Design a protein with these regions (language model features):
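A secondary-structure micro-motif
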Residues: 1-133
Length: 133
């Protein structure tokens, strides 16, 4: 059985050919436990090209994450189909990796909206994954 590098531990980025899928949360010998971006308990700091930042949470639906945005905190510049990137804040995910695009904008209250983001990477379309060290 191949030996796993000691450099690989929890909180490493997991990718497939389409992009970021999630991150490692546990490594045991040659097995990696991965939490997907779309998992309800996962969060990832994101941004768009207009410097809108948000901490997105998994929606619990395949390939979907969301941000709840308080519209009273200033101008928010986002729109449907706009590309979303990893912000690099938090130190786990590299800055500037395209992770998806805005799929839907839902009004929660007159002062708050929910942005639904459709992720680029689908973990079900690949049998091969990489771990960024």
């Amino acid at each position: 059985m191949p030996e796993v590098s000691s450099d690989i531990d929890s909180f490493k980025v997991v990718i497939n050919p389409e992009g970021i899928v999630g991150q490692t949360i546990k490594v045991n010998r040659s097995l990696f436990e991965v939490i997907l971006l779309s998992d309800k308990s996962h969060k990832i700091p994101i941004q768009n090209e207009n410097k809108f930042f948000c901490e997105a949470s998994g929606l619990g639906i395949p390939k979907k994450i969301f941000c709840d945005v308080d519209l009273t905190l200033g101008d928010k510049d986002f729109e449907l189909k706009q590309k979303i990137y990893s912000s690099g804040l938090g130190g786990i995910f590299p800055k500037g990796i395209e992770i998806g695009s805005i799929y839907e904008i839902q009004d929660l209250t007159p002062k708050e909206v929910r942005i639904i983001i459709d992720l680029n990477a689908d973990p079900l379309t690949s049998n091969y994954f990489g771990v960024l060290l």
